[in-house]
């Protein structure tokens, strides 16, 4: 059985809530909560965050996650 890869889109410049991926929720950025839940999915080999903002990329790397930059 092959393993799945989860890619989480995380855009910093949202029109309704700018900076949402970095919004602090009980001491962690929102993107970290999402990332940690994705790691719990059965059959997942890797989790990546796709972002167009270096602040999000650095936050993901700070908690040990994997991030890839996209064009904005």
Swiss-Prot record:
User: Where found in the cell?
Assistant: Cytoplasm
InterPro entries associated with the record: Cytidylyl_trans (IPR003329), Nucleotide-diphossugar_trans (IPR029044)
Catalytic activity from the UniProt record = 3-deoxy-alpha-D-manno-oct-2-ulosonate + CTP = CMP-3-deoxy-beta-D-manno-octulosonate + diphosphate
A Gene Ontology biological process in which this protein takes part is: lipopolysaccharide biosynthetic process
Please name the pathway: Nucleotide-sugar biosynthesis; CMP-3-deoxy-D-manno-octulosonate biosynthesis; CMP-3-deoxy-D-manno-octulosonate from 3-deoxy-D-manno-octulosonate and CTP: step 1/1; Bacterial outer membrane biogenesis; lipopolysaccharide biosynthesis
Q: Which molecular-function annotation in GO is an example for this chain?
A: 3-deoxy-manno-octulosonate cytidylyltransferase activity
Q: Per its UniProt record, what Pfam families does this chain match?
A: CTP_transf_3
Keyword terms: Cytoplasm, Lipopolysaccharide biosynthesis, Nucleotidyltransferase, Transferase
Its cellular-component GO annotations read: cytosol
The reply on keyword Nucleotide-binding is no
Enzyme nomenclature, EC number: 2.7.7.38
- The protein's predominant localisation is cytoplasm
Q: What does this protein do?
A: Activates KDO (a required 8-carbon sugar) for incorporation into bacterial lipopolysaccharide in Gram-negative bacteria.
Which family is this protein grouped under?
Belongs to the KdsB family.
Q: How does it assemble?
A: Homodimer.
Stated name of the protein:
3-deoxy-manno-octulosonate cytidylyltransferase
Q: Which organism is it from?
A: Escherichia coli
């Amino acid at each position: 059985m092959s393993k799945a890869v989860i890619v989480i889109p995380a855009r910093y410049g949202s029109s309704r809530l700018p900076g949402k991926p970095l919004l602090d929720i009980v001491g962690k950025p929102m993107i970290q909560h999402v990332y940690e839940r994705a790691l719990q999915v059965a059959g997942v080999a890797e989790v990546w965050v796709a972002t167009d903002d270096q602040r999000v990329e650095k936050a993901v790397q700070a908690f040990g996650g994997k991030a890839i930059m996209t064009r904005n």
